């Protein structure tokens, strides 16, 4: 059985849509960034840390998603004001989303990631506040969800599931590790 080290309902949804046999056992870690830490170094450190306690008999996966604008990491907002500030910073601009995948299987540890580009609508302060009030994006990097119908995303280049928080193309590269966990096998 696959062990997903995440509480994200979006990651759970992606694995369910693949019809995989898995259970959820999140690992609580400190997700603070280190001083002068490059976004991809941060992503790798967090993904591998989330793998947590390891047993050779388990197939563990962890993910983390970051929004990167002007080489700065935008994580999950801590409160309403921070969510509004992030969205104002992103409004009318293009930024990158990186989702990382940590894998532990039979003593092997792997890390890989995907980048996507997201193009935001130009929103005024009122539109941003209304969005935050309606969607409460406090569990999402960058303070938004690509899946939100009335959200700030105008368009994107790359993988929808990557922006959602699960780098599915990268996950498929490791299919030899997880294909035996497909339901019905």
Curated annotation (Swiss-Prot):
Cofactor(s) this protein requires: a divalent metal cation
E.C. designation(s): 3.6.1.9
Pfam families assigned: Maf (PF02545)
Subcellular location: Cytoplasm
Active site: 64 (proton acceptor)
Principal location class: cytoplasm
GO molecular function: dTTP diphosphatase activity; UTP diphosphatase activity
GO cellular component terms attached to this protein's record: cytoplasm
Site (Important for substrate specificity): 10, 65, 147
Record key words, sorted: Cytoplasm, Hydrolase, Nucleotide metabolism
InterPro entries: ITPase-like_fam, Maf-like
Catalytic activity: dTTP + H2O = dTMP + diphosphate + H(+); UTP + H2O = UMP + diphosphate + H(+)
Domain of life: Bacteria
Gene Ontology process terms (BP): nucleotide metabolic process
Classification via PANTHER family: BIFUNCTIONAL DTTP/UTP PYROPHOSPHATASE/METHYLTRANSFERASE PROTEIN-RELATED, BIFUNCTIONAL DTTP_UTP PYROPHOSPHATASE_METHYLTRANSFERASE PROTEIN-RELATED
Function: Nucleoside triphosphate pyrophosphatase that hydrolyzes dTTP and UTP. May have a dual role in cell division arrest and in preventing the incorporation of modified nucleotides into cellular nucleic acids.
Family: Belongs to the Maf family. YhdE subfamily.
Protein name per Swiss-Prot or TrEMBL: dTTP/UTP pyrophosphatase
Native source organism of the sequence: Leptospira borgpetersenii serovar Hardjo-bovis (strain JB197)
